[in-house]
Curated annotation (Swiss-Prot):
Organism expressing this protein natively: Prochlorococcus marinus (strain MIT 9215)
Family assignment from sequence similarity: Belongs to the chorismate synthase family.
A single BP term in Gene Ontology: aromatic amino acid family biosynthetic process
PANTHER family in the record: CHORISMATE SYNTHASE
Record carries keyword tRNA processing: no
Protein name, as recorded: Chorismate synthase
Catalytic activity entry: 5-O-(1-carboxyvinyl)-3-phosphoshikimate = chorismate + phosphate
Subunit description: Homotetramer.
Known role: This reaction introduces a second double bond into the aromatic ring system.
InterPro entries the record matches: Chorismate_synth, Chorismate_synth_AroC_sf, Chorismate_synthase_CS
Keyword Amino-acid biosynthesis tagged: yes
Coiled-coil positions: none
Catalytic activity, EC: 4.2.3.5
Length: 365
């Protein structure tokens, strides 16, 4: 069971949804990096359950504990251990599901592969596992900001069939966090919130799309063939719970264009090390390597699998049964998934930044 991610900037998460705690070991972080613990806590607060009436009612404080690797606000270059204790877990909510495979959950596949069942809140398959990722991602975001002035901004673009068209030039973290659904369009966000509440009352759920914009990306991140930057971003983002799709740049819509329409023409620049393009259909990555333009991505999240409606399924004996979920869950995962997307993008970019420095740092281009 793989619980580690990254090559140099390596993250290993641990813990289960209804266990004693969840956390992360972050190895490979450079020493003497200034780390704002409050910023880490703020990122955890953004993904915390119980933050609004459109998220799960599970009420966790999610207070971060730094066990090692940071002293007096500076990284030591040693493994950084961070922990969050579970305080509002209710495993008994799942007692009636011990031998039942919940539709579109990990119960059935975990049983087939490992001979165990992750019915109690999903175990390692739960979004609670992402606490460690978000904490590590907050460290990565600070490293990117300090060394490259790189900024990662993710927001909810679509909920169910309610879509938005955001002006990326005017996007900001304050606008994203100005409402509980994390869509920076005031009118559209109100419609999204009402749709989520409507489905929640019906015992149902919905999915949607998160859009991500990365500004001030260093050129040269990523490597040809098997370690392309977009390939690692896709793997990282598709490893998040409930993800079902990934696009970069023009994505699937680019298939409707001709080559003459899709090509990103280069334009004259005073600094040849900073290639600029008229358009950005490539999404800031060409040949698997960042070109210095903004990286633009979209990530699709399925409707929450745990719903309040009665459903047909089978038990461990293969017999058909009826079940109705009793556990606390999000009617829509997207508002809390925004900081998860930020974190995974930051972890990939920092890992590639360090890889690029290791391979090309001594080369004078």
């Amino acid at each position: 069971m793989s619980s580690s991610f990254g090559k140099i900037f390596r993250v290993s998460t641990f813990g289960e949804s209804h266990g004693g705690a969840v956390g992360v070991i972050l190895d490979g972080c450079p020493p003497k990096l200034k780390v704002d613990i409050n910023m880490i806590q703020n990122e955890l607060d953004r993904r915390r359950p119980g933050q609004s009436d459109i998220t799960t009612p599970r009420n966790e404080e999610d207070k971060i504990e730094i066990l090692s690797g940071i002293k007096e606000g500076l990284t030591l270059g040693t493994p950084i251990a961070m922990l969050v204790r579970n305080k509002d877990q209710r495993p008994r909510d799942y007692d009636n599901l011990d031998q039942v495979f919940r539709p579109s959950h990990a119960d059935g596949t975990y049983h087939l592969k490992y001979g165990i069942q992750a019915s109690s809140g999903g175990g390692r398959a739960s979004a609670r596992e992402t606490i460690g990722r978000v904490a590590a991602g907050a460290v990565a975001k600070q490293l990117l900001k300090n060394f490259c002035n790189t900024e990662i901004l993710s927001w909810v673009k679509r909920i169910h069939d309610i879509d938005s068209d955001i002006n990326k030039e005017k996007i900001s973290l304050n606008k994203i966090d100005s409402n509980i659904v994390r869509c920076p369009d005031e009118k559209i966000s109100a419609e999204m919130i009402e749709r989520i509440k409507q489905l929640k009352r019906q015992g149902d759920s919905c999915g949607g799309v998160i859009e991500c914009l990365v500004k001030n990306v260093p050129s040269g991140l990523g490597m040809p063939v098997f370690d392309k930057l977009e390939a690692d971003l896709a793997k990282a983002l598709m490893s998040l719970p409930a993800t079902k799709g990934f696009e970069i740049g023009s994505g699937f819509s680019g298939t409707y264009l001709k080559g003459s329409e899709h090509n990103d023409a280069f334009i004259k620049s005073d600094d040849i090390r900073k290639l600029r393009t008229i358009s950005n259909n490539s999404g800031g990555i060409q040949g698997g390597i960042s070109n210095g333009e903004n990286i633009e991505m979209k990530i699709a999240f399925k409707p929450t699998a745990t719903i309040g409606k009665e459903q047909k399924t089978v038990n461990a004996e293969g017999k058909e049964v009826l079940m109705r979920a009793k556990g606390r869950h999000d009617p829509c995962v997207l508002p809390r998934a925004v900081p998860m997307v930020d974190a995974m993008v930051a972890l990939v970019l920092v890992d590639h930044l360090l890889l690029n420095q290791a391979q090309c740092g001594l080369i004078d281009n």
